[in-house]
Amino acid sequence: MIDVPHEVIEKLQIFQDLVQKWNKAINLISENSTQNFWKRHILDSLQLIQYINDKEIHLVDIGSGAGFPGIILSIAGVASTSLIEADLRKCIFLEKAAKISNNNIQIINQRIEKTEISCNILTCRAFSNLNTIFDCTKNISVQNKFLLPKGKSYLSEIKEARKKWLFKCLINQSITSKESKILEISDLTKII
């Protein structure tokens, strides 16, 4: 299990309240997932922190939506986070949510394909398959790794991606679901 300081838990509770308040207006998360919010969203995002050895990094979260996992990781201690989100309404929410964290959070309201930025780690949650993630982030310089929570189709996604890309991939077990994995992908190179 993940050891989380009391102060972080308090901030995550504030974030949960904010998501649930805004969800009525802009549909940040599915109504079905509100009953199991802590496990489904908070813990599922928070578990990524165990794969971030140095918190003094710049992390990019693409398709940030409701702030999972980017805001959660910032609250948990990641020093600098950029959230890339095309939907202006969600960016307004993210601006409010960013104030909960003591760390630096930048909100970028534009399409991922048009974003040129450098980071240590790139993450996203419930965004797309590996090929799409790699294709749309070609202008983002990822220095260390992609850190990606994936569901039961992770093996077929890896197989498909290897047709177009060379990469190293560590597969870790998710703590929120037996079917889910956390992929650590590095040394990405396009082959076709």
Curated annotation (Swiss-Prot):
Q: Where is the protein localized?
A: Cytoplasm
Q: Which GO terms label this protein's molecular function in UniProt? A: rRNA (guanine-N7-)-methyltransferase activity
- An example Gene Ontology CC term for this record: cytosol
Keyword check for Cell inner membrane, yes or no. no
Q: What class of enzyme is it?
A: transferase
Question: What keywords is this UniProt entry annotated with?
Answer: Cytoplasm, Methyltransferase, rRNA processing, S-adenosyl-L-methionine, Transferase
- Primary localization class, coarse: cytoplasm
Tell me the domain of life. Answer: Bacteria
Q: Does the keyword Transcription regulation apply?
A: no
Write out the residues that bind S-adenosyl-L-methionine: G63, F68, I112, E113, R125
Q: Which InterPro entries does the annotation name? A: rRNA_ssu_MeTfrase_G, SAM-dependent_MTases_sf
Name the job this protein performs.
Answer: Specifically methylates the N7 position of guanine in position 527 of 16S rRNA.
The record's comment on protein family reads: Belongs to the methyltransferase superfamily. RNA methyltransferase RsmG family.
Protein name, per record: Ribosomal RNA small subunit methyltransferase G
Q: Which organism is it from?
A: Rickettsia bellii (strain OSU 85-389)
Q: Which gene encodes it?
A: rsmG
